[in-house]
Design a protein with these regions (language model features):
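Cytosolic nucleotide-binding catalytic cores of signal-transduction proteins
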Residues: 2-73
């Protein structure tokens, strides 16, 4: 569905973990935190925390939505 997305993401952000790549893939597909939490079998708040940490790690400014950034990768 998104050929090369994870490869481009890993190239742009080499320190990204497997868990973070999975979260990025779910966000790129347009899934909500609640949907992701169901797939990962974790609490929705845990997904929100992971999103905040991911934003910091990828150095995404507060003006840009995480999902919008991932669509540009």
């Amino acid at each position: 569905s998104y050929p090369g997305f994870l490869t481009r993401l890993k190239t742009k952000h080499p320190a990204i973990t497997t868990k973070e790549k999975k979260l990025c893939a779910y966000l790129r597909l347009g899934l909500s935190s609640k949907e992701i939490s169901g797939l990962q079998n974790i609490a929705p708040q845990s997904v929100e925390t992971a999103r905040v940490r991911l934003r910091k790690k990828l150095k995404i400014s507060g003006k840009i939505r995480l999902s919008a950034y991932l669509h540009q990768v």
